[in-house]
Amino acid sequence: RTHARGILAGGHIILGLPGETRDELLRQASVIATLPLDMLKLHQLQLIRGTRMAREYEEHPECFHLYEVDEYIELAIDYIERIPQSVVIERFISQSPRTLLIAPDWGLKNYQFIERLCGRMAERGTWQGRLCETVGESMGFCIDVL
């Protein structure tokens, strides 16, 4: 209803929550593609000191998959290939203060990450929405390639 009233609508997705698989995340992207979103923020799971999730990580690290930067770049590219070009991607990563961050610590600024992501997209010859077909203003559906 928000989108129908001309109000910009956005989504915020954390990639890599405990128990999520890569295949589930890519299926999720195909579902997100059908929503009337104008913008989308993505970022990696970050473990922050003093949080419940940090305690869960200490107790059950096997339940967490903390992406290495190159692995996350590949995932982010695969994800946005399923997101329509009409959706503005506002963020790919988040940065928490090092004093609070447990993991992952990639040591990259946002612009450095974007440079690497764009370079890898060029190497792969891909783009946002490559696996999507637009249906209306900002809704689409994605080709299931899994």
How should each PLM-predicted stretch be described?
Residues R1-I14:
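Radical SAM/AdoMet-radical enzyme domain recognition
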Residues I14-G19, L47-R49:
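Conserved radical SAM core fold
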